Swiss-Prot record:
Keywords: ATP-binding, Cell cycle, Cell division, Cell shape, Cell wall biogenesis/degradation, Cytoplasm, Ligase, Nucleotide-binding, Peptidoglycan synthesis. This is UDP-N-acetylmuramate--L-alanine ligase. InterPro entries: Mur-like_cat_sf, Mur_ligase_C, Mur_ligase_C_dom_sf, Mur_ligase_cen, Mur_ligase_N, MurCDEF_pg_biosynth, UDP-N-AcMur_Ala_ligase_MurC. Its EC number is 6.3.2.8. It comes from the Bacteria. GO terms for biological process: cell division; cell wall organization; peptidoglycan biosynthetic process; regulation of cell shape. PANTHER family: UDP-N-ACETYLMURAMATE--L-ALANINE LIGASE, UDP-N-ACETYLMURAMATE--L-ALANINE LIGASE-RELATED.
Length: 475
């Protein structure tokens, strides 16, 4: 669906003077989704990124003007410039925008403008945001409500991470990493869990992070709804401070939407949800792990509270194929030592890695798990070093890639070599450090056994590396 510029006056009336919107870092998951929505609303979109890829190519095909690399002349004609939090202050396009007094806003500020005239559902939390956002989006789509959605990862069944719908509903992932979710004014807010992460934003103070989440929930109108996980002790500690209606979900006896009798067969989960009115709903999921049951129950709770029929909820959840890079099965391959399965997963925080390993163990029985792990950011590796040592010791074989810096400078003692040394000292697994990823296939062939599940784990380039591996193994 594409609108003329005249029609935009009706959609976002306050933005009628805006003609061209320029995105610095347009290839990022959150940025590209918003760019796609605005492109389909009829705005002229331009954007730049350091590398070309599937996302930038798709935007170019849809009509966006894409530049690879950053240069001052790229902002020509822009009415407003949108920046991702990854963009440094000395970026030439950002510097030029400020010199020319072109308004520069954060990604979340633009998302807030899109949400302003819609019924917004925002999903926040340390883990599970992308999957939960995708599940809610698919339920509303199944219910023929044609929602707009903007997600931080690919919604597999839609084949994209953003969609412009015709209805008033907007479902969006809310980003706490730079506290920019405070710009959003939703009608429903979901918080999946809360753990220390992105602590540089919160000056290393977890109490400040908690207070920021409460502030986010108070952006709800007095008639709004907060949906929170009852299994998370930090969230339950915050509930008395939230001056809005709160509905809870989880395995906890105290949950309003309570999960019972969870079982996993292979990579399929099934369980029962006891609703606040004691209605029992049997759920089937084709994505593994208790963490996905929690994500699905958050989505179910939102849908039930908003009056969506059970049939649409259950069909959408049963059909849900996952979000991009969340336990993404790349295939089974015959190698010299036998048949193996390769899975790509985005989890890069110790808790996420832990639940992925548990889901794999449940579905893969007594077979071995071989992990290819790429730490993401030196600061996260430093802050959660001991937790990484413990969780990475849970696999049967471990290949460690160098830290994916994500623009950070190296930190002494927070590199892959230090992580390998500490894991080896714990004595449960002997990690292999592979700095030259062109050697990865050869190293794997030396250690894999028949029936192994290979988990490529991390938020950096490990996904591209594992997909390249899958392509080479097909030939």
């Amino acid at each position: 669906m594409k609108h003329s510029h005249e029609e935009i006056r009706k959609i976002i009336p306050e933005m009628r003077r805006v003609q061209q919107i320029h995105f610095i870092g347009i290839g990022g998951a959150g940025m590209s989704g918003i760019a796609e929505i605005l492109l389909n609303e009829g705005y002229q979109i331009s954007g730049s990124d350091i590398a070309d890829g599937v996302v930038t190519q798709r935007l170019a095909q849809a009509g966006a003007k894409i530049y690879i690399g950053h240069a001052e002349e790229h902002i020509k004609g822009a009415s407003v410039v949108v920046v991702s939090s990854a963009i440094k202050d000395d970026n030439p396009e950002l510097v030029a925008s400020k010199q020319k007094r072109i308004p520069v806003i954060q990604r979340a500020q633009m998302l807030a403008e899109i949400m302003r005239f819609r019924h917004g559902i925002a999903v926040a939390g340390t883990h599970g945001k992308t999957t939960t956002t995708a599940m809610i989006s698919m339920i509303y789509t199944q219910a023929k409500l044609d929602p707009t959605f903007v997600n931080g990862g690919l919604v597999k069944s839609a084949g994209k991470n953003a969609h412009l719908g015709a209805s008033r509903y907007l479902i969006a992932e809310a980003d706490e990493s730079d506290a920019s979710f405070l710009h959003l004014q939703p009608m429903v807010s979901v918080v999946t869990n809360m753990e220390p992460d992105h602590m540089d934003t919160y000056e290393g103070d977890f109490e400040k992070m908690k207070a920021t989440y409460v502030k986010f929930l108070h952006n709800l109108p007095f008639y709004g709804l907060a949906v929170m996980c009852a299994d998370d002790p930090v969230l339950m500690e915050l509930v008395p401070k939230v001056g809005r209606q709160v509905i809870t979900y989880g395995f906890s006896e105290q949950a309003d939407y309570r999960i019972e009798d969870y079982e996993q067969t292979g990579f399929q989960g099934h369980y029962t949800v006891i609703c606040p009115n004691n209605e029992r709903i049997n759920v089937l999921l084709n994505v593994p792990g208790k963490h996905n049951a929690l994500n699905a129950t958050a989505a179910l709770a939102v849908a039930k509270e908003e009056g969506i029929a059970n049939e649409a909820i259950l069909e959408a959840l049963a059909d849900f194929q996952g979000a991009g890079r969340r336990f993404d099965q790349l295939g089974e391959f015959i190698r010299p030592n036998g048949k193996v399965r390769l899975v790509d997963d985005y989890g890069h925080h110790p808790t996420e890695v832990d639940v992925t390993i548990k889901a794999a163990r449940e579905g893969w029985g007594d077979k071995r798990i071989v992990m290819i792990f790429q730490p993401h950011r030196y600061s996260r590796t430093r802050d959660l070093f001991d937790d990484f040592v413990q969780v990475l010791s849970l696999v049967d074989a471990l290949i460690m890639l160098d830290v994916y810096a994500a623009g950070e400078a190296p930190i002494v003692g927070a590199d892959s070599k230090s992580l390998c040394r500490s894991i080896r000292n714990l004595g449960k697994v002997d990690p292999i450090l592979v700095s030259d990823t062109s050697q990865l296939g050869d190293v794997l062939d030396q250690i894999i056994q028949d029936g192994d599940l290979i988990l490529a784990q991390g938020a950096g380039s490990v996904s591209k590396i594992s997909r390249g591996l899958a392509e080479s193994w097909k030939n």
